[in-house]
């Protein structure tokens, strides 16, 4: 009779490796040509151990084969310029993504070029794979920060880690989905759905993004498997509820003026429910009431968030997805 859905996203801001990526500088250094993926603070990528991961496709006479690739080592660094050569570095220095953000891969004495190195990664992950050394390769590879997450603070009350936006919510949603399997009663008439989209950071307009028919197609196929016709599927959609699970901004200790005057969430004070008059988030009075009631009944603390009226803020995937699958305000009948 309906779906209970959590929607999160798997991607984070990064740098995508371009085709033909190798750049030789001064006949000595080999850097990689990359482009920005998503919105980021570029300076946070400097002087950190980085690597690449993603998908590679090998083309051979026997066909096309896909591989997941992770160069599991400290492979790259985007080097900063020393203060002695850039005295204004602390005075709002801007970074050019085509000039300043090229990761250093090695020098001209490197054993493998980048393409050969990726092929060796494919081979090392599974010794039983057919050799791809002589095959043509196409790739979708992204840089990632190799540093591990850390719990810190006087009372270990904070966590810092790469890609919390939005792996944190994707993981929590998946764990909740699995845990709920043990508590579903016989008269439960909903289908629980954990949906993790891709490409939220670049607008969601891809076949695996929120601005696609991916979710609605899957939900309709589930309804067909239950023997429902189109009308009953639409009725099920109208009786569904979706939580868009993404991160929120806490009040910044050094920039408290950047937060809204009355909606000011703090770290470790509970789940954040986000509002936006320009419809960048999914919350309205009905969905808020439902979620608030759930939290109150389970003694789950929650807070509210809104942007300052003179700061645009970000957006997320929920409003995009809801506009396509037409989940209405379902539990008026609850």
Model-derived segments and their meaning:
Residues 8-10, 30-32, 37, 160-203, ...:
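Alpha-helical metal-binding/catalytic segments enriched in His/Glu/Asp
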Residues 2-88:
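A generic, well-ordered mixed alpha/beta core segment in the N-terminal half of proteins
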Residues 1, 69-160:
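Soluble metallo-hydrolase cores and metallopeptidase-like ectodomains found primarily
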């Amino acid at each position: 009779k309906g779906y209970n859905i959590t929607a999160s996203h798997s991607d984070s801001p990064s740098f995508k490796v371009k085709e033909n990526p190798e750049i030789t500088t001064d006949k000595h250094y080999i850097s990689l040509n990359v482009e920005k993926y998503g919105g980021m603070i570029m300076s946070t990528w400097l002087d950190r151990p980085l690597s690449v991961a993603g998908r590679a496709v090998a083309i051979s006479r026997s066909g096309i084969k896909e591989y997941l690739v992770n160069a599991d080592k400290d492979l790259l660094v985007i080097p900063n310029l020393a203060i002695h050569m850039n005295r204004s570095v602390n005075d709002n220095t801007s970074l050019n993504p085509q000039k300043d953000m090229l990761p250093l891969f090695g020098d001209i004495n490197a054993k493998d070029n980048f393409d050969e190195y990726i092929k060796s990664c494919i081979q090392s992950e599974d010794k039983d794979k057919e050799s791809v050394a002589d095959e043509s390769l196409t790739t979708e590879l992204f840089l990632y920060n190799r540093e591990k997450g850390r719990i810190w603070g006087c009372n270990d009350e904070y966590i810092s880690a790469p890609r919390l936006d939005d792996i944190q919510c994707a993981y929590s949603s998946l764990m909740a989905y699995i845990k709920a399997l043990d508590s579903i009663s016989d008269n439960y008439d909903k289908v629980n759905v954990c949906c993790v989209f891709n490409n939220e950071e670049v607008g969601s307009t891809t076949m695996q993004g929120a601005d696609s028919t991916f979710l609605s197609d899957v939900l309709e196929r589930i309804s067909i498997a239950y023997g429902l016709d189109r009308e009953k599927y639409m009725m099920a959609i109208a009786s569904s509820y979706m939580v868009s699970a993404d991160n929120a901004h806490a009040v910044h200790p050094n920039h408290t003026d950047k937060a809204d005057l009355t909606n000011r969430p703090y770290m470790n004070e509970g789940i954040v429910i986000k509002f936006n008059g320009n419809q960048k988030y999914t919350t309205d009075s009905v969905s808020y009431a439902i979620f608030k009631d759930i939290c109150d009944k389970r003694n789950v603390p929650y807070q509210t968030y809104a942007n300052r009226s003179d700061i645009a803020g970000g957006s997320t995937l929920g409003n995009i997805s809801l506009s396509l699958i037409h989940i209405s305000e379902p539990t008026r009948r609850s």
